[in-house]
Amino acid sequence: MVELYQKLLGMRRIKRKISWRVSAKPVSEEDLNRDLLASKLLKAGDVLMVHSSLSSIGNVLGGPEAVCRVFQRVLTESGTLLMPTYHQPEPILKMIKKGSLVDLRTAESTMGKLTETFRTIPGVKRSSHPFSSVSAWGRYSKEMTSGHENSPYICGPGSPFAQLIERSAKYMGIGIDIRVIALYHVLEENWSDFPLRVHYPKPFNVRYIDPSGNRVERQLIILDPAVAKTRIDREVEGAWIRKWLTNYMRTKGILHGFKVGQANSWIVGSQSFYDEMKSLAIRGITIYTTEREFNTIKKEG
């Protein structure tokens, strides 16, 4: 009964979303291009990671293909565009246990229609990770998708995420909040003095087919779900830290808000965001900090 209710509720939400997109004012490529340029936050040659909710932009003429073209047009081939082409880890791990292999040449992104469309564009390259791959287009696409297989950590040294820091990339969200920023985990997995243990203590073996068609077997270290109960991406438990951190980064001049079509959007500089998160962690404030812990830190500090 509960499952049926959840299914019906999900169908109603989808119908409302489709109805809103159809009735919304059409958004053209020129509109999107104008929005990006008017923000004065992007330029040719930038390295940019984009997370998105396509439906939040509105009724985009040309669909996700048009959105991809606009970003390519703004960044030009001298820039680099990246998008997450993740899968949920649980189904992938179940597949592996059953002896099946995820094939990164064909496996679809579960991060939305825009990311899946981007993945299939000619010239786009994909990193070698069974459930946290990144796809990239442009000048550094090969370099930024190479090396993901060399670290057991998702955001470890050489990963596309760590390279965002090294290349002074910009990080953008369209119609979504800051829970999606992977730079949090770059800090956890590259700074030895991070104040919490957030990973399983032991690695586990995974097998998959990489974007070149090679069978890969290697070890991975993943985040511990038990520790993640209060993390920033948790809908209820993480709501307070999302709100506080958004305001904090905006006040610091690190997070900049603007519109893309109908979507409330934001952009941060990867290096400045990383540095500020490190400064907060030194004070004991992380994406896992509860509101009670935060208030205690404030009283003591």
Question: What residue ranges belong to the model's regions?
Answer:
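Short, flexible loop segments at boundaries between secondary-structure elements
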Residues: 194-226
